[in-house]
UniProtKB/Swiss-Prot annotation:
A GO term for molecular function: nicotinate-nucleotide-dimethylbenzimidazole phosphoribosyltransferase activity
Entry's EC annotation: 2.4.2.21
Organism name: Roseiflexus castenholzii (strain DSM 13941 / HLO8)
Function (record text): Catalyzes the synthesis of alpha-ribazole-5'-phosphate from nicotinate mononucleotide (NAMN) and 5,6-dimethylbenzimidazole (DMB).
The protein's name: Nicotinate-nucleotide--dimethylbenzimidazole phosphoribosyltransferase
Database matches in HAMAP family: CobT
Pathway info: Nucleoside biosynthesis; alpha-ribazole biosynthesis; alpha-ribazole from 5,6-dimethylbenzimidazole: step 1/2
Amino acid sequence: MSLLTDTITRIGSLDSAAATAAQARQDVLTKPQGALGRLETLSVQIAGITGQTRPRLNNPAVIVMAADHGVARRGVSAYPSEVTSQMVLNFLNGGAAINVLARHIGARVIVVDIGVAANLPSHSELIDRKLGMGTADFSVEPAMSRAQAQQAVEIGIACAYDAIASGVDLLATGDMGIGNTTASSAVVAAITGRPVAEVTGRGAGIDDAGLARKIAVIEQALALHHPDPRDALDVLTKVGGFEIGGLAGVILGAAARRVPVVIDGFISGAAALIACTLAPSAQPFLIAALRSVERGHDAVFAHLDLTPLFDLGMRLGEGTGAVLGMSLCQAACKILDEMATFGEAGVSGKVEG
């Protein structure tokens, strides 16, 4: 049995007893029922995920998958491909936005080279799982082989398992890859059936001509390859990216180990579509951090029946939104665990009648 198949079979359902107990405790804490809104429902979801009635999330980590895209050569991005490798080094040196926000909440940043088109120097904080020097240009040929697609997902699973084995109890997804909004839009269009123009945005800031070119390239690729929306590996093979597959694996690995996973922006959303097409049972384990500026993100939420925690007009990626989302998860669980009940505090409850 492959690692992918084994992982999918290990994904269960939410622990209803733990969730019910968490909700019962929320209802007697010193506040009107429901007064903390999503923080309350978030804590109950996390109780169901972990099977703990009062979960404590003390060891967060964000897994940042980095890879390049052959389709970037078609002029679909505002930045050159070498920025991918340059930003990976920035991550490793602690100078990127993701590093700042991760330090803010005490989260570890795990950087994975799953397909950067450069030979990166060895570094103690870099995990080298390179599947190739970027994907192929999917406007003229499949982005990768089916074997590579499965490998990408399994690399993500293994990275999640390793992080959890080291004590991580809350995971987030992050990405780096010039051209990856193009691949993500192609994945989203393929799986949801939405028109390409409806799910394709400006990425890192392309102009009108660049956006028109990006849409045309994706439409050309979908017409050429006809990816099967019911077969996630087929979609990943034909129009995906190595980091998208890797992040799908992180999601599946976290779900199989009953660890909450906070998904970042549009690229992580495309990965979530891959993951949940492979294993629909993974959906309840997902926590959507933010609504990205990328126009296709709402199609992801609609398809997966997810509601993001916040909308701050963000579009950076890297896991920045997901790390902010992890801080809300921690806050929600601390409310559930540390607040006093009406009985404990000697506070009168709601007058009935």
